From Swiss-Prot:
The lineage of its organism: Eukaryota, Metazoa, Chordata, Craniata, Vertebrata. It is found in: Membrane. InterPro entries: Tetraspanin/Peripherin (IPR018499), Tetraspanin_animals (IPR000301), Tetraspanin_CS (IPR018503), Tetraspanin_EC2_sf (IPR008952). Keywords: Glycoprotein, Membrane, Transmembrane, Transmembrane helix. The chain crosses the membrane at residues 14-34, 50-70, 84-104, 224-244. It is a multi-pass membrane protein. Plays a role in the cell surface localization of ORAI1 and may participate in the regulation of Ca(2+) signaling and the VWF release in response to inflammatory stimuli. It comes from the Eukaryota. PROSITE patterns: TM4_1. Residues 1-13, 71-83, 245-248 are cytoplasmic. This is Tetraspanin-18.
């Protein structure tokens, strides 16, 4: 009976880790393609620090999942105690890091207020400077969601660095102007009319409200997904340790 249980856990662990292995391989493939694609996508990514960072994050996640799945599959099939122990420790480290991140996110959630983002924007935003990660991120957000500032265009009246760099010649950055279509490379309808704050040439809604409304549902889904991932990792650690102890 004990042998049947161990055999069942062994195959369950192999199947699950095989899918983890495939997922990691897919992420690795996507990350490598984005960074080395010869058709021009590489140049687009290279001009945006945010996209470049995202591509490296995808690569890192893919590599981590690839290695994790490989260790789990080999440890289960070969019944290798050393691989199973390494797999257990690997999962344990990831579990503790994710748990710590979740606890920190819960503790500091109250700091991510409208006032906090407004203060950061007015203090650090540099306009169309894509070499500054903070400004490039804000520009991407404003263009993607069709919004302007945290609360609206009036935020940029207090943006000291932005006003200094533009010599007070611009009321709002180019990212606040409406485009057709709404993409980074889309044509601005009218930069002059946008600077005068006239509809329909400027996005007047603040990004805080737009993003909050957009992601309100997804926050709960992300929380449920995170709990599910932690539970799966916990079961994998139990399976790995049971196999480790059962293998003679």
């Amino acid at each position: 009976m004990e042998g049947d249980c161990l055999s069942c856990m062994k195959y369950l662990m192999f199947v699950f880790n095989f899918f983890v292995f495939l997922g990691g391989a897919c992420l690795l493939g996507v990350g490598i393609w984005v960074l080395v694609d010869p058709t021009g996508f590489r140049e687009i990514v290279a001009t945006n620090p945010l996209l470049t960072t995202g591509a490296y994050i995808v690569l890192a996640m893919g590599g981590l999942l690839f290695l994790l799945g490989f260790l789990g599959c080999c440890g289960a099939v070969r019944e290798n105690r050393c691989l199973l122990l390494f797999f257990f420790l690997f999962i344990l480290i990831i579990f503790l890091v994710e748990l710590s991140a979740a606890i920190l996110a819960f503790i500091f959630r109250e700091h991510l207020t409208r006032e906090f983002f407004t203060k950061e924007l007015t203090k650090h935003y540099q306009g169309d400077n894509d070499t500054d990660v903070f400004s490039a991120t804000w520009n991407s957000v404003m263009i993607t969601f069709g919004c302007c500032g945290v609360n609206g265009p009036e935020d940029f009246k207090l943006a000291s660095v932005f006003r200094l760099l533009t010599l007070d010649t611009e009321e709002v950055p180019k990212a606040c102007c409406r485009r057709e279509p709404q993409t980074r490379d889309g044509v601005v309808l009218s930069r002059e009319e946008c600077q005068l704050g006239r509809n329909p040439f400027i996005n007047k809604q603040g990004c805080y409200t737009v993003i909050l409304n957009t992601f309100e549902t997804y926050v709960y889904l992300a929380g449920a997904f995170a709990i599910g991932v932690l539970a799966i990792e916990l079961f994998l650690m139990v399976f790995a340790m049971c196999l480790f102890r059962g293998i003679q």
